[in-house]
A protein has these predicted regions:
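Positively charged, amphipathic and often flexible ligand-engagement surfaces
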Residues: 1-327
C-alpha cells in the first residue's frame, strides 16, 4: 500500500529552496488577513505598473505553473516524469467572447495534441468549452432558449472545431478531459459531452466529462449516465472533482432566488465524492475515471477500492490527478 506519510519519497525531487518556497507560500496563504493584505498590495503594484514579473515567477508562478508556453513547460514535464508523474497541459482560457480568442484556443489545443502525440509523459489533454464559445450561448442552450442567427453561426463554428479536436485526439489515441463549469451552463456542457461520448467512446474511452461532487445532483447524474451508456452501448469517462465555484454558486442562487445547487457541508461533498469513486470502481468495465483530488482520505479510499476489486495500480482505466504545486 502507498504511504502518503513518506515525505522522503514524496519530496525526493525537490531542492531545499523548492521546499522552503512551498512552506512559505502555504504558511502565508493560511492566514486570511496576511493573504488579503498581500493581495491588496499586489493590486496596487500592478496598477502602478511597477515591474515585479521576476518576483512572481520566482514565487507563486514557479510553485503553481509549469510554464508560460507549451515549450516553456517541457522542463517541468520532464522533471515530473522522472518521478513517474504524467502532465496534463491545461491551456488556461475560459470565458472568451470573440472569434479571434476562440480561434486562438482552438489552435493552441491542436498544438497541445501535436505535442502529446506518442508522448507517454502527457496522457491527457484538457480544455474548457467556454474557451471555444461564448458563455451566454451555453447559458441559453442550458435553458433551452432560442439562439439568434449570429449565435447559431457561432454554434456551428464551435461544433466544427470541437469535431476537429476530437477526431484528431481519436486519431492519435489521446483522451480528452472537458472541464466542468458553472451550474447554469453545465447542462449544455453535459449534453455536448454526452453526444461526444456516444460518438467516440464505443471501443475505448476518449472523451471524459468532469463531475463536480459539491453539487448535490451529481451522484444521481453519473449513475443515470452509466445506465444510459450500458443501454446504448458506449463507455463513459469521468473526471471526479469536488468543485471550483462554491461561493459563486451560493451567491448566484441567493441572488436569483433558486435552490442552492451545492452542498452546505464539506462532509456531504466528501461523502458524495467517495461514493462516486465506489460506484465507478464497481462499474469499471464501462467507466474510466480520473480522481482529481488533494484529499488524502479519498486517495487512500480509491486505493482500497482497487485492492478490494483486484485492480492493479497501473490499470489504465484509473488515474489520479492533482494541481501542480498543491500536493
Amino acid at each position: 500500500m502507498i504511504d502518503f506519510n513518506n515525505s522522503k519519497n514524496a519530496f525526493s525531487d525537490k531542492s531545499d529552496f523548492d521546499l522552503f518556497r512551498a512552506f512559505f507560500l502555504f504558511k502565508t496563504l493560511n492566514y486570511p488577513i496576511i493573504s488579503k493584505f498581500l493581495t491588496d498590495i499586489l493590486k496596487v503594484i500592478l496598477y502602478l505598473r511597477i515591474p515585479i514579473d521576476f518576483l512572481i515567477k520566482l514565487t507563486i508562478f514557479k510553485q503553481f505553473c509549469g510554464g508560460e508556453t507549451i515549450s516553456d513547460s517541457s522542463k517541468t514535464i520532464d522533471k515530473l516524469w522522472k518521478s513517474s508523474i504524467g502532465t496534463i497541459l491545461d491551456y488556461s482560457a475560459e470565458g472568451q467572447e470573440n472569434e479571434d480568442d476562440f480561434k486562438n484556443v482552438f489552435d493552441e489545443t491542436l498544438k497541445v495534441l501535436d505535442i502529446a502525440k506518442d508522448n507517454s509523459k502527457i496522457p491527457f489533454v484538457v480544455f474548457k468549452l467556454t474557451g471555444l464559445i461564448q458563455f451566454n450561448i451555453l447559458k441559453k442552450l442550458s435553458k433551452k432558449q432560442e439562439l439568434s442567427e449570429k449565435e447559431n453561426a457561432t454554434l456551428i463554428r464551435f461544433n466544427k472545431r470541437l469535431d476537429i479536436i476530437c477526431k484528431k485526439a481519436n486519431k492519435i489515441n489521446k483522451p480528452i478531459f472537458i472541464d466542468a463549469e458553472e451550474s447554469w451552463i453545465q447542462t449544455a456542457i453535459d449534453n455536448i459531452v454526452f453526444s461526444l461520448m456516444k460518438q467516440f467512446n464505443k471501443e475505448k474511452v476518449l472523451i471524459f466529462n468532469t463531475v463536480q461532487m459539491y453539487r448535490h445532483d451529481r451522484l444521481t447524474y453519473l449513475m443515470n449516465l452509466s445506465q444510459i451508456a450500458q443501454e446504448e452501448g458506449f463507455k463513459i469517462g469521468l473526471k471526479i472533482v469536488r468543485g471550483a465555484y462554491h461561493e459563486k454558486e451560493i451567491d448566484r442562487a441567493l441572488e436569483k432566488g433558486y435552490t442552492v445547487p451545492v452542498h452546505e457541508k464539506k462532509s456531504d461533498t466528501d461523502k458524495d465524492f467517495n461514493n462516486a469513486l465506489k460506484f465507478c470502481i464497481e462499474n469499471i468495465n464501462h467507466i474510466s475515471i480520473c480522481s482529481g483530488t488533494h484529499n488524502i482520505e479519498s486517495s487512500m479510499y480509491l486505493l482500497k477500492l482497487m485492492e478490494e476489486n483486484s485492480i492493479e495500480n497501473n490499470d489504465d482505466r484509473i488515474y489520479s490527478s492533482q494541481l501542480l504545486g498543491m500536493s
